[in-house]
């Protein structure tokens, strides 16, 4: 792994290009979300100077503190679980929320979007592994959630997101990425417009790109090991 953030970023960008090429895709169809959770502002500032433009955070309050210190420097995405009591602040802070996992949360975001006169862009998080420790709607419930969201005028669902089980080999994760894409394709056949697939992290993003990811969420490969 290169020693500097700039070197690591260039290396990740090259790996994204290579994975897209293997899949016969235009590299520009893949958006890099650099996940800065737990990273101090000084380190994030280095990443911005190196060319990072989109930052992903897991926690609303942590993001709020960082955004206050880095106003106007980046576009921010929420990639972690969102509680309904944090929804109002999330609407104000984030350009895209990756983790809508219930009708209740969708309705809450819609209400706060109306109050803020903002169309809230989001993705529906699907729990592909059926893991109780992870958030996300069940695969079987995804269409009902999308149908409910379609009736909410201040909510714009743009695709699906998933965090598959962590498995030793990226190839073992491939079937989960394939399933998310197949689910998206099925739902598009049912009339939902879902251009975005947020899937793939440091461990497995190349496989995710080969399977159709349009947003990859990469932290360690850019920022290095997280602080203890």
Task: Describe the function of each predicted region.
Residues 1-203, 209-211, 225:
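Conserved alpha/beta-domain cores
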Residues 213-228:
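Gly/Pro- and small hydrophobic-enriched strand-loop and loop-to-helix capping segments
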């Amino acid at each position: 792994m290169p020693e500097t953030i700039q070197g690591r970023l260039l290396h990740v960008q090259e790996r994204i290009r290579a994975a897209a090429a293997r899949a016969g895709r235009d590299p520009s169809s893949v958006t890099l979300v650099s996940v800065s959770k737990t990273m101090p502002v000084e380190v994030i500032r280095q990443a911005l100077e190196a060319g990072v433009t989109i930052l992903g955070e897991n926690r609303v309050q942590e993001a709020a503190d960082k955004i206050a210190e880095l106003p106007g420097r980046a576009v921010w995405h929420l990639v972690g679980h969102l509680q309904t009591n944090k929804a109002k602040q999330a609407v104000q802070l984030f350009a895209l929320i990756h983790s809508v996992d219930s009708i209740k949360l969708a309705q809450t975001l819609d209400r706060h979007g109306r109050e803020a006169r903002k169309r809230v862009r989001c993705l529906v998080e699907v729990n592909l592994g059926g893991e109780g420790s992870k958030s996300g709607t069940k695969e079987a419930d995804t269409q009902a959630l999308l149908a409910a969201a379609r009736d909410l005028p201040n909510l714009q669902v743009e695709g699906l997101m998933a965090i598959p089980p962590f498995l030793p080999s990226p190839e073992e994760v491939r079937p989960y990425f394939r399933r998310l894409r197949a689910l998206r394709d099925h739902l598009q056949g049912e009339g939902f417009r879902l251009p975005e697939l947020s899937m793939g992290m440091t461990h497995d993003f190349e496989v995710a790109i080969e399977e159709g990811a349009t947003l990859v969420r990469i932290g360690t490969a850019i920022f290095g090991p997280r602080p203890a």
